[in-house]
Amino acid sequence: VTTAAFAPPFIEPGELPAALREQGYAVLSPQGVSEWLGAPLAQLEALHADWNDLPPDAYLKDGGRYRTRRHACFTVDGESIAQVPHRAHWQPVEYNALHGGMQRWFAPMHEATVAQPVWQRLLQRLGEAASGMRGTKAQPWFVEAHQFRIDTAGGIGRPTPEGAHRDGVDLVAVALVGRSGVKGGETRVFEASGRRGERFTMTEPWTLLLLDDARVIHESTPIQPLEEGTAGWRDTLVVTCRAQGFQGD
């Protein structure tokens, strides 16, 4: 059965601060992301080779083998960006009932990737977006970055095995880096304390979703292979900004 995919509700980059304040989320098209960063899309697309070299996630409690990932942490304060010593990823059980409450150590992002000017620029702009969303002047943001590949080698892959959730941070950014040979993977965003929701499917590489984590919950539906017996994948980058230190400190 083929289901219609809803297109993302793209906004212009200049509308981003108001959209985050008014509805708690915003979606930029790849062209919008390029404009927002002041960088050619090709510089972002050049990062994609990294996703072919992500080690398996050894912590999946559903017994799955469908997720590979890398992780890195930074502090972002205005134009100052610093990578911090590699550390575990930790979330409280309140925010991640499946994998919360445990120290999860993932392989670090490649040094060559985090040294790229476009990577530094992305973190800087996300810090600015977080400050604008919270109505603060430039302040330190504690940033975690996650490279994910979800594959369908086992028949089904779950981008968010924990279900609809919040991350316990201020700003969440989810970029679709690429997808191939899969159906599904619909993004769903709901008001945390209301009834409004939005659903759409990100299909173009470097489509970017930004979320006010205090106001909305989010999930992505499972992916399946387009053709039985042919494995596919969905690659994403998730970056979170938190004001009061890293979770677990």
Outline where the language-model segments fall.
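N-terminal auxiliary "cap/dimerization" subdomain that precedes the catalytic jelly-roll/cupin core
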Residues: 1-96
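Structured loops at beta-to-helix junctions and adjacent beta-edge loops in soluble globular domains
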Residues: 31, 76-79, 146-148, 176, ...
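Signature of the catalytic double-stranded beta-helix
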Residues: 75-142
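Conserved aromatic-histidine-acidic binding/catalytic patches
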Residues: 35, 111, 161-164
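Catalytic core of non-heme Fe(II) oxygenases with the double-stranded beta-helix
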Residues: 135-204
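Generic detector of solvent-exposed, compositionally biased contiguous segments
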Residues: 3-11, 137-158, 207-222
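A short, structural micro-pattern
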Residues: 68, 139, 167, 214, ...
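Catalytic core of Fe(II)/2-oxoglutarate
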Residues: 186-249
